[in-house]
Design a protein with these regions (language model features):
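Extracytoplasmic gate region of multi-pass secondary transporters
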Residues: 1-49, 110, 137-145
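C-terminal ends and interior cores of transmembrane alpha-helices
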Residues: 71-85
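A membrane-interface helix-boundary motif in multi-pass transporters
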Residues: 62, 146-171
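Helix-to-loop junctions at the C-terminal end of transmembrane segments
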Residues: 48-60, 148
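Cytoplasmic membrane-interface "Motif A"-like loop-to-helix N-cap segments
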Residues: 57-70
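Multi-pass alpha-helical transporter architecture, strongest
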Residues: 81-84, 166-190
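A late C-terminal transmembrane helix in Major Facilitator Superfamily
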Residues: 118-153
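Hydrophobic core of transmembrane alpha-helices in multi-pass small-molecule transporters
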Residues: 89-106
Length: 190
């Protein structure tokens, strides 16, 4: 469930909703919007090796780093519901970079789940994660759009609609993070 939510929120935000949110609600140009979304991707690119190193060498836990990443994503979504239009671009740049960085923790779900399974079941485990990774965007892209349209039919791309979508993402992330606390973990003895 956690991989469905994490990647669903990321894909819905990055691929569809970040652009209209930044241009129509926050009032930024297409160039600034594109650069902010690019920063999100840079955050993910840099986050993957950093969080992998933290997981493998420093903390020796995948579960803990994933939970920290999910919590970071949640905090950023909550901040996005609170910031006013016209906030300084540097604040959004930091938030978008961190959103990508913390989302990179989701990549640790793959080895976390794989290490819990017997070797002969590793392929099935990876198939399960990939399945839920792909279902997440399908659910969140359509679901958030439908929610925004249903709650605000005349202003489905207005500030209130985006806040409702962000709040729904927050509820899902709280649930996913809470459930992830209950996953088992094989100790990393490296």
């Amino acid at each position: 469930f956690s991989t469905l939510v994490r990647y669903g929120v990321l894909a819905a935000f990055q691929a569809l909703w970040a652009g209209p949110y930044l241009m129509e609600v926050m009032g930024y140009s297409t160039l600034a919007t594109g650069n902010l979304i690019l920063l999100l991707n840079f955050g993910m690119i840099l986050g993957a090796p950093c969080l992998g190193t933290l997981s493998d060498r420093l903390f020796r836990t995948r579960k803990g780093v994933v939970i920290a990443g999910l919590t970071g994503i949640l905090l950023i979504i909550i901040i996005l519901t609170l910031i006013p239009p016209g906030i300084h671009l540097a604040v959004l740049a930091l938030l978008f970079f961190c959103f990508g960085f913390f989302n990179a923790a989701g990549l640790l779900m793959y080895p976390h789940i794989k290490e819990m399974m017997p070797l002969e079941m590793a392929g099935v485990a990876m198939t399960g994660i990939n399945f839920f990774n792909m279902i997440g965007p399908a659910v969140f892209l359509q679901g958030l759009g439908s929610l925004m349209q249903a709650l605000y039919p005349d202003a489905s791309r207005g500030p209130e609609a985006f806040n409702a979508a962000f709040k729904m993402c927050s509820v899902c992330l709280v649930t996913a993070t809470t459930l992830y606390f209950f996953t088992r973990e094989k100790r990393l003895d490296r």
